[in-house]
Amino acid sequence: MQKKPRLKLPHTLVLIYLLVIAVYALSLVIPSGQYQRAEKTFQGQTRLVTIPGTYGAIEKKLLGPQWLLIAPIRGFQDGALIIFLIFIFGGVFSILGKTGAIESGIQRLAVFFSRNPRSKKFVIPILMVVFSMAGGVYGMAEESIPFVLIFIPLALSLGYDSVVGVAIPFLGSAVGFSAAFFNPFTVGIAQGLSDIPLYSGLAYRLILWVVATIIAIVFVMLYANKIAKDPKQSPVYEIDRSRGYAVPVETAKDVAWGTAQKLVLLILFLGIGLLIYGILAEGWYMEEIAALFLGIGLVSGIIARIPPSEMATHFVAGAKDVMNVTLIIAGGRAILIILKEAVVLDTVLRFTAGLISAVPSLITAHMMFLTQGVINFFIHSGTAQAALTMPIMAPLSDLVGITRQTTVLAFQLCEVINPILPTSAVTMGVLGVAKIPWEKWAKWFVPLMVVLIIFSLIALIPPILTNWGPL
């Protein structure tokens, strides 16, 4: 009996453009309207925030069909920084691959773990705690992209797959970001806009961060152990076979490596140290990070004595490998551009606020969580989402009988869905440099996402029952 062919999802770029078409169609029927906005300075930065109670309908703004083509172009403009950052990462790591330094370093690590097999089991939990702390303290997001390119070969050398290599830095920081206790871009901004003490409620948030981090670590470790026993169970088995730098621990041999390779690795690690310092102490963002890695690539190529033309060839080849993801990022941005140009984003916000006010107070926070999750599909910046929604949600929470602290928690926890969003520049940037198809990653991540959503909904119950306020 012939098996029925499995349903195959269309290319991710096709899925994104179908979403663009769907949102455009909705923009034709959703009434146009907007809230008034005012400038508010917080933590040294001035932002436009919505003013509650000021929503007003305006004359319907109909976008012509040409916006189906204009919006993705605007998406490139809107996402130019992160798109350029991803091009830089692709090109620089192609040069680093040519030097052979990363492959040699992984070989040495594999030898270490072959001689110390007990230490292998500590790699995932220790590193994920570090990245979760980074997400919880300073809101690590885009900064996780270069680490993916380092941890994939490490994971392969340990007998795992590239999904584990992505999960260590990306899921680690993403879980920390959503269950953050000190993240200035979500907790800090949202509390400031809600007029509650900055970083209040720290103790309960710290408990949630610990539990969420443990959930993610256990999930990744169980999966990693399964792959170690049978690599063919990996959804990216064929993709990983084409990667040239995997050295299984069991077959690792202590090989000699040259001075140039040692120097290149030294430059890379010094660069990562400078990256961490720049982010924490100097407030570096994508421009500075891109410049740093461009410098790392150029210096590494010179040390390895790669001719300039050959270096340029490898850079272009690496940048070409991530072209697909830059197109997807532009498409994801196009969705928000259509909502803004049609002036319907505030209408959607007002409608969702109405839904929240209509449900019983016991599940109001859960409704806020789900609502923020929907908005998060279109707006991925925690700061931008806070500026849009918290001035509306905070006074709404007073009316429905829950505390503003609980409302802030519902807002931040909705970030647990970020790692699956095809409209997220960070998610698609990570998958692009990792060369993992979105559909394979999504299928793998869904079980963990469901667990994290259930955890988030449960986590909102004690604040509701105890009338959790600033502590």
Where are these regions (language model features)?
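Alpha-helical transmembrane segments and, especially, the helix-loop junctions at the ends
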Residues: 131-148, 156-205, 216-221, 373-388, ...
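Membrane-interface alpha-helices at helix entry/exit sites of multi-pass transporters
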Residues: 116-125, 160-168, 200-204, 362, ...
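Hydrophobic core segments of alpha-helical transmembrane domains in multi-pass membrane transport
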Residues: 13-29, 86-94, 130-134, 176, ...
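Hydrophobic alpha-helical transmembrane segments of multi-pass integral membrane proteins
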Residues: 87, 116-150, 329-339, 355-395, ...
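Alpha-helical transmembrane segments and their helix-start/interface "positive-inside/aromatic belt" motifs
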Residues: 4-20, 156-168, 261-264, 316-325, ...
